[in-house]
Regions:
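Extended repeat-based solenoid scaffolds, especially LRR ectodomains
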Residues: 1-18, 437-453, 457-461, 465-486, ...
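Aromatic/pi-system hotspot detector in well-structured domains
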Residues: 18, 33, 37, 82, ...
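Short alpha-helical linear motifs
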Residues: 81-85, 128-131, 147-150, 169-172, ...
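Acidic, Ser/Thr- and Gly/Pro-rich intrinsically disordered linkers and low-complexity segments
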Residues: 1-9, 99-100, 209-222, 284-304, ...
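Surface-exposed polar/charged interaction patches
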Residues: 286, 290, 379-382, 386, ...
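Short coil/turn segments at helix-helix junctions and helix-capping linkers
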Residues: 2-12, 28-31, 43-58, 73-76, ...
Length: 671
């Protein structure tokens, strides 16, 4: 080393002799040669990192020649000397920052791969380690050559010599992952992800190679080796790409990760899925989300949103395998999504819950239904925007009315209404023609910059809760009755009312159960009903509290008009009544008829009493349409049980309100 210390004229005589000694002793038995190389290899480590580039170049070139000669000898099974022999390349690549030397190391390794791939065994680990270090470089030529060689190994060498490379398979995948995470070369990133996807094919086509593989440091059951050595490294590295890269690359990584699951998941064992989803759920980990609000919002709106739908698809595709081991985790993840201050993610959470139920509900066990209904109940309870009724600007005084106060004031003790009233009201859906004239989309609210930051956050969170409430109402309606059925009923009811055609020849509503209604117990339906009515009563309380709505409006909670929850008020009641009426006409639920009738009469009485207190023309108009459809359905009901039990209980206020409405219509026509 002293001879090489001169910065201008280093003497390389001794280094040359060391190279010759290595060359002539290469034929010794492994035990002897390994001891010799232990000393010589350490010397090459130091010389290869010499600040004098000429010395380092000589050392690397000498190493290349020795390595080519050594690799020609091949390597017997269970030996690891190639790994020791090639380690100086790895050390030099890690420690030497000279672009010239690093480029030279990569070229030396590339030459070995191209000429000696068939003889390399344990040396693959060093090769991938060198390329892994090159993958994060900023020098385009280094990255390009390293990636080309890695791609050649992944597509050609693996195809021909897979058993010899299997020990380094996960190193290859890790190396490709590092290329994908180099933000300076986006094209290389995308191609690296494609190659990882290609590696999945080797695992699928050659599972026996993984089962047969053994090593001293491997204490894994043969049936799990294909997971530990094959599938897990691929999926784990894809998850690392998702967590480390910018949007376009991580989106591609996410897509490929779920493509692998969907394509090859049928070969996965149940406990493999548990390991896999521990990785997947890291995408939603609060501790791993970006700290900046803008980046966090982008992450939730794009990556979390994409992952959520993909998880739902995979869960549906492999429901039989996953329902026992992952249902609780998936429901918990959906619940987490609707709790975040991100409207898109909250909507997606409810939509995915709906998809999971509609696509798999026929296969649900009673226990699964209980868990699902409880999840919906939890979401409903935690997303009711109670602060809408209690918020006051700084310095304001006064106690706002609670939902219970409003409900108590409006609930009038009346004689029970005909059960047939339900039929009309339960057919009305928030997106039908009946409510098209409403300009009540609270999600279009504008929060002015004049509010301080905590109030902005509060208003934003309240708006998202309003969105979730509407989405959940729609989810329950779609889940229980199936979307197409409900929409068809709405159209038929409205058409009948508009034609004023009351004879039996009119189009009859189909009553076949296309949704999940027949799979839900009465107790589960009552749970959902309670959620709907709680949501309805809250919306009703808010809509009736003009003072609070005005306060929020002045604070900028909604832009051009007072905020309202008309859609939540009407759609929740319509869905609840739809459920009650269906149960009341279901012969298989006779044991629940008494409870259903009691609930029907209470709900209908409360609804009509509330309608009679309305003063807003648009508000009354919405309910007038509901009553109009109700009357149309009453005259079509032919169920003697319904008529006998309710004919004498028609509420006088209802008749009076209809007469008033008819009088107003007649007066307008006369004018």
């Amino acid at each position: 080393m002293d001879e090489l210390a001169s910065p201008t004229h280093p003497r390389m005589f001794s280094l040359q002799k060391i190279v010759e000694i290595s060359y002539y002793n290469m034929g010794r038995i492994r035990l002897q040669w390994s001891r010799i190389w232990e000393v010589i290899g350490d010397h090459f480590n130091k010389v290869g990192c010499n600040p004098n580039e000429d010395v380092a170049i000589f050392a690397v070139d000498s190493l290349r020649q020795l390595s080519m000669k050594f690799l020609e000898k091949g390597e017997l099974a269970n030996f690891r000397f190639q790994k020791d022999f090639l380690r100086p390349f790895e050390h030099i690549m890690k420690k030497n920052r000279s672009p010239t030397i690093r480029d030279m190391v990569v070229r030396c390794i590339a030459q070995m791969v191209n000429s000696q791939a068939g003889n390399i065994r344990s040396g693959w680990k060093n090769i991938f380690s060198v390329f892994h270090l090159a993958a994060s470089d900023q020098d385009e030529s280094i990255v390009e050559l390293a990636f080309q060689t890695t791609g050649h190994i992944s597509t050609n060498v693996f195809e021909k010599h897979f058993p010899a490379t299997i020990d380094s398979f996960q190193d290859a995948v890790k190396c490709l992952s590092e290329f994908a995470c180099n933000a300076s070369f986006p094209d290389t990133s995308m191609e690296a992800i494609r190659l990882i996807r290609h590696c999945a094919k080797y695992v699928s086509d050659r599972p026996q190679a993984f089962k047969d593989y053994t090593s001293d440091d491997m204490n894994v059951a043969p049936e799990d080796r294909v997971w530990v050595r094959g599938w897990f490294p691929i999926l784990f590295e894809l998850s690392c790409i998702i967590n480390r890269c910018k949007l376009d690359v991580r989106t591609r990584g996410l897509t490929v990760m779920f493509e692998v699951m969907k394509t090859y998941g049928h070969t996965f064992e149940k406990h493999w899925w548990q390991d896999l989803f521990r990785i997947v759920f890291r995408i939603f980990d609060n501790m791993k989300l970006p700290e900046q609000q803008t980046e966090k919002a982008e992450w939730m709106t794009t990556t979390c949103n994409h992952a959520l739908y993909a998880i739902s698809d995979v869960f549906t595709q492999y429901f039989e395998s996953l329902s026992d081991v992952l249902l609780d985790d998936i429901l918990a993840q959906l619940y987490w999504c609707v709790q975040q201050d991100n409207e898109q993610l909250a909507r997606s959470g409810t939509n995915c819950l709906e998809n999971v139920v509609i696509l798999n509900g026929e296969k649900f066990t009673p226990e699964t239904w209980d868990k699902t209904c409880n999840c919906m109940l939890d979401i409903f309870k935690t997303t009711i925007p109670h602060a809408l009724l209690t918020w006051r600007p700084a310095g304001a005084e006064g106690d706002p009315m609670t939902p219970q106060d409003i409900s108590d004031r409006q609930l009038v003790c009346t004689v029970g209404l005909p059960v047939s009233l339900v039929y009309l009201l339960c057919q009305i859906r928030p997106y039908s023609n009946i409510t098209q004239y409403h300009a009540d989309k609270i999600t279009s609210a504008h929060v002015p910059s004049g509010l301080n930051f905590p109030e902005q956050r509060l208003f934003s969170a309240l708006l998202i809760k309003c969105v979730v409430q509407l989405e959940l109402i729609q989810t329950i309606d779609n889940m229980v009755f199936f979307p197409a059925t409900s929409r068809k009923e709405d159209v038929e009811n409205l058409a009948a009312a508009q034609r004023d055609a009351l004879d039996a020849a009119d189009v009859l509503v189909e009553t076949q159960d296309q949704g999940m209604y027949r799979y839900l117990t009465s107790e589960q339906l009552f749970k959902l009903l309670d959620c709907l009515l709680e949501s309805h009563r809250f919306a009703k309380a808010f809509n009736a509290n003009n003072e609070q709505r005005t306060t929020l409006w002045k604070a900028g909670f909604k832009g051009k008009s007072k905020p309202n929850l008309l859609k939540q008020e009407t759609s929740s009641l319509a869905c609840g009544l739809r459920i009650l009426f269906r149960m009341y006409t279901d012969d298989s639920r006779q044991t629940a008829w008494e409870e259903v009738q009691r609930r029907l009469l209470n709900v209908c009485s409360e609804a009509v009493a509330y309608f009679l207190t309305l003063t807003s023309e648009s508000h009354r108009e919405a309910w007038t349409n509901l009553l109009l459809l109700f009357l149309t359905k009453v005259l079509k009901i032919s169920d003697d049980r319904v008529r006998i039990s309710t004919i004498n209980n028609i509420d006088r206020p209802l008749i009076w309100s209809v007469e008033v409405e008819r009088g107003e219509v007649a007066g307008e026509e006369a004018q």
